[in-house]
Amino acid sequence: MGSRNKPIIRCARKAGSWYEGQPDILDQQLTQWLEQAGPPEFGPAKAIISPHAGYEHCGSCAAYAYKEIGPEVSRIFILGPSHRVRLNGVALSPASIYETPLGNLTIDRDVYNELYATDMFEEMSLQTDENEHSIELQLPFIVKAMSKRTEPYKIVPMMVGSIRPEKEAAYGKILAKYLADPENMFVISSDFCHWGHRFDYQFYEKSWGKIYQSIERLDKLGMKSIKDLKLDSFVSYLKEYGNTICGRHPIAVMIAAVEYLNSENKTQNQNYQIKFLNYAQSSRCQHMYDSSVSYTAASLKDVKDAHVGPINDVADC
């Protein structure tokens, strides 16, 4: 593991390109998106699913997830996929500090040490960490969402590789106790369908309407499989449709953690529910030569802590 003689800082490599690098302008953008998203709909989140594209494409969608975060949590786990490096497991950062234009975030290395002790986690290089965008794109939103908290908080970022369902279940079991802790919450970084020739994916069911309508229905079938909170359901969906959900492995690990917690709670009803609060596409595909990326925002809640009342779930629309 990395040297502990002095803090290793992960630089904000995408600031100024994927999102605004000027702190005051970035803060204004985040404020506007969060205000447009409105007040929390479903109580304090135990986990959210949030996109990780450039903010001009997905910032307004991501705000629907981040508005659900309560500043009472003291530790935020961030699970992002690996786009550039092939991993056969889950990797942790060598850094102690993550830089953002809005202020630095501190990694909870005590939790890292607990995870390393399971022999299931490896350490990535700083270059691998800085080259990956899926975690970094969540950081400014985290700083903004936690700005009302007066006490310190820490993050636990991890990069989830292309792992099989058995490993997803194993990592879910390890992380379940952290998800159950009321001091913690999880951010799951994922875009949804990447459609088009450049993504080598052009599933189109003509009976569902135009191409963009087919994509939306495809994505919403995926959302419904996630709402089951059963790993087998999500895995079966992916096998049937092959949807290019880049964060499918982080999502699956979260589902596995919830499924484990629910299985341990044998005398009660299911503990957790997930709602999808927003859905968007980067463009509306009309022709087979078009392309688009889909984004969604979701919030996982402990049922006993959830607000009572009707929730508009875009997965059901």
Segments from the language model and where they lie:
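Caspase-like cysteine protease fold
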Residues: 271-305
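Active-site histidine-anchored catalytic micro-motif
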Residues: 4-256, 260-270, 279-282, 286, ...
